[in-house]
Design a protein with these regions (language model features):
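C-terminal ends of transmembrane helices
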Residues: 125-126, 169-182, 230-245
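Generic detector of multi-pass transmembrane helix bundles and their immediately adjacent loops
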Residues: 200-279
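N-terminal charge/polar-biased segments
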Residues: 1-26, 128-132, 261-279
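Core alpha-helical transmembrane segments of integral membrane proteins
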Residues: 131-205, 213
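Soluble N-terminal domains of membrane-associated systems
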Residues: 1-114
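Alpha-helical transmembrane segments and their cytosolic membrane-interface
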Residues: 91-143, 149, 153, 253-261
Length: 279
């Protein structure tokens, strides 16, 4: 995560030596791993469990951590001094590859296969893992939209139209992601674009005499916007007893759903006012 997105407060008074220096290093490593998991979409229980396993593996029994959906608090008793760390971690995007890599690293650390100094280098490599290229993301969005339009009862014509919708949607999402637009605004604009392109495709296909279903095209197009990961992660957090984080994620999913509904509804309402346009 970029420096201007991180607000932290690490405190270890004085000049730690011996066991205190090691405790400080373990604290930083555990927080670094937890930060990587959380900002890439990891569940709360997974973040906390991973951090505790890393601390125990390096002999820090006095390690404690409290994790929320967008931040974590950790401390370790290094003997005469108490090290603490606070991180504000807004989630940028889900990256399952990084989550899997951190999980594999934590298991290797727990098995005693990774030295403390080497672990920092491994974490840096994980954080440097690239995201998918824009072209790949755009193609995946288009194909996914087409497949879901067909799965929800649409025809091959509907699937082809949904493919065009998906290919138009992902570039907008990438631009809004780079501009750091809010999640509500991004999904509102994305849903509006889906409805507009779907309506345009339906009118063009109708003019060509091809039968199509506008609702199936829209359904396929909005599937990439549906907050499935946030919803399932929230349920997992609640099942694990973390009701606060689970509720926050559930509220986040509801707000995204509202944004999608508002975006689609507004465009369809405007489209219905245009003479000659059938909604």
């Amino acid at each position: 995560m970029e420096a201007d997105c991180r607000k932290d407060a690490d405190t270890l008074p004085g000049s730690p030596a011996g066991g205190e220096a090691r405790a400080a290093q373990v604290l930083r490593l555990a927080v670094y791993a937890g930060e990587t998991l959380l900002e890439n979409g990891g569940e709360i229980f997974r973040v906390q469990d991973t951090m505790e396993r890393i601390a125990r593996a390096y002999g820090q029994a006095g390690f404690h951590v409290y994790v929320l959906t967008n931040g974590l608090f950790a401390c370790v008793d290094g003997g005469q001094q108490l090290g603490t760390s606070l991180r504000f971690i807004p989630q940028a995007a889900t990256h399952l590859g990084r989550i899997m890599a951190v999980n594999a690293l934590s298991r290797a650390i727990a098995a005693g296969e990774v030295e403390l100094e080497d672990a920092f280098g491994r974490i840096e490599q994980i954080r440097a893992m690239p995201s998918k290229r824009a072209a790949v993301r755009t193609l995946a969005c288009g194909v996914g939209s087409a497949c879901f339009a067909y799965l929800f009862g649409g025809s091959w014509v509907d699937a082809a139209a949904a493919l065009a919708v998906g290919l138009a949607l992902e570039p907008l999402r990438i631009v809004l992601e780079r501009a750091r637009a809010g999640k509500f605004v991004s999904n509102l604009l994305g849903a509006g674009l889906v409805a507009a392109v779907s309506l345009l495709c339906a009118q063009l296909l109708g003019a060509l005499g091809a039968a199509c279903s506008l609702d199936k095209i829209i359904i396929g197009g909005i599937i990439p916007l549906v907050p499935g990961i946030a919803l399932t992660t929230g349920i997992r957090d609640v099942a694990g007893g973390d009701y606060l984080s689970g509720t926050i994620r559930a509220i986040d999913a509801v707000l995204v759903a509202v944004a999608i509904a508002c975006g689609v509804g507004f465009v369809l309402k405007v489209g219905a006012l245009i003479p000659g346009v059938t909604v």
